[in-house]
UniProtKB/Swiss-Prot annotation:
Subcellular location: Cytoplasm
Taxonomic placement: Eukaryota, Amoebozoa, Evosea, Eumycetozoa, Dictyostelia
Function: Translation factor that promotes translation elongation and termination, particularly upon ribosome stalling at specific amino acid sequence contexts. Binds between the exit (E) and peptidyl (P) site of the ribosome and promotes rescue of stalled ribosome: specifically required for efficient translation of polyproline-containing peptides as well as other motifs that stall the ribosome. Acts as a ribosome quality control (RQC) cofactor by joining the RQC complex to facilitate peptidyl transfer during CAT tailing step.
Main location: cytoplasm
GO cellular component: phagocytic vesicle
InterPro entries, sorted: IF5A-like, IF5A-like_N, NA-bd_OB-fold, Rib_uL2_dom2, Trans_elong_IF5A_hypusine_site, Transl_elong_IF5A_C, Translation_prot_SH3-like_sf
Record's comment on post-translational modification: Lys-55 undergoes hypusination, a unique post-translational modification that consists in the addition of a butylamino group from spermidine to lysine side chain, leading to the formation of the unusual amino acid hypusine. eIF-5As are the only known proteins to undergo this modification, which is essential for their function.
Entries under PROSITE patterns matching the protein: IF5A_HYPUSINE
An example Gene Ontology molecular-function term: ribosome binding
Name of the protein this chain belongs to: Eukaryotic translation initiation factor 5A
Similarity-based family: Belongs to the eIF-5A family.
Name of one Pfam family that matches: IF5A-like_N
Residue numbers bearing the Hypusine modification: K55
Length: 159
């Protein structure tokens, strides 16, 4: 390959904050109500137990967790000395201004508009729609992890 050919090939990386989506932590340091990545899904730990060191190795940590977006239950067993990924999870509150074509029109506390989040198809989505029909101002909690976002709760704004 000549120098000219190499210059013609351009590679663009996705723009981002530079922050990692996950960070490693030792299995023995995990705690109930914490977060963990199981099978590529961000999950909240609902139950944990540790088995004793066996004849052939390490103590094992048994983790039961629920996907923070779908509510699906996952289980993982890992040696207590091994590392496991923990997702960087953030929660932000938005005021729902409108729903258009199945997408929420959201406003954050700083006045920034967000319009790329789909209206949930579950009870939360129905509740948002009902509040808007009644002229109420829904306030939603949006959770972000592993590059995904989802509405996890709704309440009436006090404004």
């Amino acid at each position: 390959m000549s120098d000219n050919e190499a210059l013609d090939v351009e590679d663009y990386a996705q723009a981002g904050s530079g922050a990692s989506l996950t960070f490693p932590i030792q299995c023995s340091a995990l705690r109930k109500n914490g977060f963990v990545v199981i099978k590529g899904f961000p999950c909240k730990i609902v139950d944990m137990s540790t088995s004793k060191t066996g004849k052939h190795g390490h103590a094992k940590v048994n983790i039961t967790a629920i996907d923070i977006f779908t509510g699906k239950k996952y289980e993982e067993i890992c040696p207590s000395t091994h590392n496991i990924d923990v997702p960087n999870v953030s929660r932000k509150e938005y005021t729902v201004m409108d729903v258009q074509d199945g997408y929420l029109s959201l406003l954050d506390a700083g006045g920034e508009v967000k319009e790329d989040l789909a209206l949930p198809e579950d009870d939360i989505g129905k509740e948002i729609t009902q509040m808007l029909k009644e002229g109420k101002e829904p306030l939603v909690s949006v959770i972000s992890a592993l590059g995904k976002e989802g509405v996890v709760s709704v309440k009436v704004s006090n404004n």
